[in-house]
A protein has these predicted regions:
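Non-catalytic, structured segments within soluble enzyme domains
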Residues: 1-43, 50, 191-192, 196-197, ...
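Glycine-rich, acidic and aromatic/proline-enriched surface loops and short helix-turn segments
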Residues: 16-24, 78-95, 128-130, 142, ...
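Short coil/turn segments at secondary-structure boundaries
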Residues: 9, 31-37, 65-73, 178-180, ...
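Conserved catalytic neighborhood of penicillin-recognizing serine enzymes
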Residues: 4, 130-186, 234, 246-276
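Mid-domain, small-residue-enriched loop/turn segments at the edges of structured enzyme/sensor domains
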Residues: 148-150, 182-223
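Second-shell loop/turn segments in exported
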Residues: 2-9, 36-43, 102-111, 149-155, ...
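Active-site SXXK
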Residues: 52, 84, 106, 110-137, ...
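A penicillin-recognizing enzyme superfamily signal
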Residues: 42-65, 76-80, 89, 96-108, ...
Length: 427
């Protein structure tokens, strides 16, 4: 009956994860853990955990269903980008005291929407297929298996660069890139970043838009984006640094082990594009914080009960820098025509980015946020913007290119353009 007398403790969601991890590491039951006199040293940043609990107590920071007026649920992961240590978590807006089993939403599977695009398409495209931020992708009408693929705004823009396609989260270029590199290639790549897929997922072109069979968890998304933030190296998350037994003997000591999954050059290029997303793209409410970020929105299911309903199912945000990776999910445990997120500007990107902004501003207060360091294997190149946008050519800026038409772009060393623009030469 020991589990029935689960002790009450503060920071419930975090402590549940600590106890679960400790029981697994020591191979003991929870009741033995409670009564065995162990001392567990956790990775929690107590001040930050208390802050996120206060943040999550503010109901106006979460969208309400436009039909029922119910406030949505949310999950939050704050991970140390470098070590994989969890420093603060929220598995819901509040912790339901006195219950034996509690739904921890950071471990609940949901469809990821566009937040998965960089993981299954663009990062492997840069790593394995020599894509650059100015690789041109055709954003023109596309039908896959008889289903039209549409951008969120239902517009198409013709030839766009990869930087624009990813930072603005266009759907058509994402599907085209995913098909170009091969669905299995993209899936295998993301598996190395800790995201599990089913056999069926290997055959889904819409996987790049979040159309997974079983979905993913906020924890898995945090791990994957922390790999981008940590220069291409993957590690498992943990809540525990050390465990001592009742005699003071250390019975477990965490040792961080990392695996280099892709190059730091690839990581830097994707991070730089996702900084554009945080400045002028889908996560623009994070502007000025030097963060890289990717939003994700999941549409309501294609079921008769939702035919007349305007709204969305899930809203995601992954934001990160070299020190902290933050993932926010918002939605309802059971989406219905009564309970769903509002669509439009009050939907996905707004509330998730507001939470992340509050969090990073609190962590860094008035101090400078760290930026991603450019690896030696990446060249900074000045391009001619007119040639890029009007001629759809990747050409170096010349001495004649006016300053306002010079754009800085990044290439892996050896793949830089060599031809100079003649756009400004008077005939």
């Amino acid at each position: 009956f020991a589990e029935d007398i689960k002790p009450a403790y503060i920071h419930g969601y975090f402590m549940d994860m600590v106890l679960e991890e400790a029981a697994s590491l020591l191979n003991v039951g929870l009741d033995d853990l409670y009564t065995g006199g162990y001392r567990i040293y956790t990775t929690m940043d107590k001040e930050l955990q208390e802050y996120v609990e206060q943040l999550y107590a503010q109901e106006d920071l979460f969208p309400k269903s436009p039909v029922s007026g119910e406030t949505s649920e949310s999950a939050l992961v704050v991970m140390d980008t470098d070590t994989g240590e969890l420093v603060a978590v929220m598995g819901g807006r509040s912790y339901p005291e006195g219950q034996r089993s509690v739904l921890n939403r950071i471990e609940a599977r949901r469809l990821p929407g566009s937040v998965i695009k960089p993981l299954v398409a663009y990062t492997p495209a840069v790593e394995m297929f020599d894509y650059t931020p100015v690789t041109f992708i055709d954003d023109s009408p596309l039908t896959v298996n008889g289903i039209p693929i549409r951008n969120a705004d239902r517009e198409t823009r013709g030839i766009v660069t990869m930087r624009e396609a990813l930072s603005k989260s266009y759907n058509i270029p994402a599907v085209k890139t995913f098909q170009e590199i091969g669905i299995s290639t993209g899936v295998s790549f993301a598996e190395k970043l800790g995201i599990p897929f089913t056999e069926d997922d290997h055959y889904r072109p819409n996987l790049v838009l979040g159309g997974m069979e079983q979905g993913t968890t906020p924890l898995e998304i945090a791990r994957a984006f922390a790999s981008l933030g940590d220069r291409g190296s993957y590690k498992e998350e943990t809540t525990i640094r050390r465990i001592d037994d009742s005699h003071g003997k250390t019975v477990y000591q965490n040792r961080i082990s990392k695996e280099q999954v892709f190059s730091e050059e690839t990581a830097f290029i994707i991070n730089d594009i996702l900084q554009t997303a945080a400045d002028t793209g889908t996560a623009y409410r994070l502007k000025g914080l030097k963060l890289a970020a990717k939003t994700g929105t999941v549409q309501l299911p294609s079921l008769p009960e939702f035919d007349e309903v305007k709204g969305i199912n899930d809203a995601w945000l992954a934001a990160y820098n070299p020190e902290y990776t933050v993932v926010v999910w918002m939605g309802f445990d059971r989406t219905s025509k009564e309970n769903h997120l509002p669509s439009g500007s009050s939907g996905g990107g707004k509330y998730t980015t507001l939470i992340a902004r509050e969090l990073y501003e609190h962590i860094y207060d008035e101090s400078e946020l760290p930026n991603f360091q450019k690896p030696v294997g990446v060249s900074e190149v000045k391009l001619d913007k007119k040639a890029l946008e009007e001629q759809k050519r990747v050409l170096l800026a010349s001495a004649l290119t006016p300053d306002e038409y010079v754009v800085t772009e990044y290439f892996k060393r050896g793949s830089e353009p060599t031809e100079q623009s003649d756009y400004w030469v008077v005939p």
